Amino acid sequence: MPTINQLVRKPRKTPARINRVPALNKNPLKRGICSKVYTTTPKKPNSALRKVARVRLSGGAEVIAYIPGEGHNLQEHSVVCIRGGRVKDLPGVRYHIVRGVFDTEGVKGRKKGRSKYGAKKS
């Protein structure tokens, strides 16, 4: 344990916060264009075909983003909106596509949690 004198000479340094979404560049959302839409499999012990897209952002960065909800209409050259938020069982996927914005349609027939999936009240 340091003495008061040592702390006066050299104060404690707080560790720098790591940025988990560097491509967003301190923005809450960013626009991008899909360069590839595909499915990938999660880490053990999970098993599925998760829908993801490689997206070139307006800042020039290329990221992999998850497409949430059941069914989607995305294809190459679709314009999408990206937010932060990783998918725990997909390594390298640190962004989510926002449903119901730009070319992304909302989830059809969604009754609960509609605001998260861009679904209109039916």
UniProtKB/Swiss-Prot annotation:
Bilayer-spanning residue ranges: none
Stated role: With S4 and S5 plays an important role in translational accuracy.
Gene that encodes it: rpsL
Domain of life of the organism encoding this protein: Bacteria
One GO MF term attached to the UniProt entry: rRNA binding
Modified residues (3-methylthioaspartic acid): 89
Protein name: Small ribosomal subunit protein uS12
Listed Pfam families: Ribosom_S12_S23 (PF00164)
Database matches in PROSITE patterns: RIBOSOMAL_S12
Keyword Cell inner membrane included in the entry's annotation: no
Any one biological process term the GO annotation gives: translation
Gene Ontology terms: cellular component: small ribosomal subunit
NCBIfam families per the UniProt record, alphabetical: rpsL_bact (TIGR00981)
Family membership: Belongs to the universal ribosomal protein uS12 family.
InterPro entries noted in UniProt: NA-bd_OB-fold, Ribosomal_uS12, Ribosomal_uS12_bac
Record key words, sorted: Methylation, Ribonucleoprotein, Ribosomal protein, RNA-binding, rRNA-binding, tRNA-binding
Subunit structure as annotated in this protein's UniProt entry: Part of the 30S ribosomal subunit. Contacts proteins S8 and S17. May interact with IF1 in the 30S initiation complex.
